[in-house]
Amino acid sequence: VQTCALPIYALATLRDETEPITVAARRLLEGFAAEDAVYIVTDVMGGSVNNEMLTLLPEYPAVHLICGMNASLVLTLASNDEALTQDELAECIADAKAQIIDCNLLLKNAAQDEEDDL
């Protein structure tokens, strides 16, 4: 069993939620030291959660906001003991993008490659 080097917190928005997500996020962010690596990962650029998190960046300039969340991205971020450099973060994002694969197309191409080899 591998434990994550960094703590992971999840915030969710519900239709009947009375507390804005920015209030909950601020409460969490206030618990971090200035030198802590903090990554906020959201699902969709331009979505309501991403837009709300964008409003926090002027108050928390050390926070990295990344949209387009997938498991590969979150696991890579959480498994690092130290803050990533900008280049390392860019590589992490590129690797996460590469994990988005149309498996049907992958199988179709593999079958076609086998036919071509005959």
What role is predicted for each listed range?
Residues 2-6:
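Short, small-residue-biased leader/transition segments that mark boundaries at the very start
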Residues 10-19:
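Short beta->alpha junction loops
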Residues 23-35:
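N-terminal small/polar loop signature for handling phosphorylated ligands or for N-terminal nucleophile
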Residues 35-37, 61-62:
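Short coil/turn segments at beta-strand junctions that form active-site/ligand-binding loops
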Residues 49-60:
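Short Gly/Thr/Asp-enriched flexible loops that form oxyanion-binding sites at enzyme active sites
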Residues 59-77:
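Short, acidic/small-residue loops that bind anionic groups at enzyme active sites
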Residues 80-106:
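Short, glycine-/small-residue-rich phosphate/pyrophosphate-handling segment
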Residues 111-118:
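Short acidic DE-rich linear segments
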